[in-house]
A protein has these predicted regions:
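Small cysteine-rich, disulfide-bonded extracellular modules of the LU/uPAR three-finger superfamily
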Residues: 1-95, 102-143
Length: 143
């Protein structure tokens, strides 16, 4: 089993089908569940799964809802981002995460995050800090 960071192939197609709305006002609901190192997630992941999702204090299935940042452009690159998200006072060990669209039929996947190694919190904050929202670093970039 492995987690491979990737923009999900199904998401690329669904952009052209207008299944995802990243506008901050009135947009889709995006969630971010966390996964153990036993999860198998990558570019071929098409939807949220409970298989190998973490459990722990102050963690609920499907993870946190994400706060969207309106899409923008920089040069010829379109981009969007999310606000950092925190599971407060939690006890969690996770190797990666999946961003998915909860409003789309079937909880369709957007992208997979690989933390590179297990990350843990013990009665503390578990935070995912998203990169700078620019054409080189934003979590979702289309060049």
């Amino acid at each position: 089993m492995a987690i491979s960071q990737a923009m999900c192939t199904s998401f690329k197609k669904e952009i052209l089908e207008a299944k995802h709305n990243f506008l901050n006002s009135g947009g889709s609901t995006f969630k971010i569940p966390l996964y153990t190192s036993s999860a198998s997630l990558g570019a071929t992941t098409t939807a949220y799964t409970t298989s190998n999702e973490v459990t722990g204090t102050n963690y609920t299935a499907k993870g946190n809802s994400l706060t969207r940042v309106d899409p923008s452009t920089s040069g010829t690159t379109a981009l969007t981002d999310f606000a950092d998200t925190t599971w407060s006072s939690s006890t969690i060990t996770a190797r990666g995460a999946l961003i998915f669209n909860e409003d789309a039929s079937g909880d369709t996947s957007v992208l997979v995050l690989d933390f590179g190694a297990d990350k843990s919190s013990s009665s503390g904050d578990f935070t995912i800090q998203f990169p700078t929202a620019d054409s080189s670093n934003a979590i979702i970039r289309i060049a």
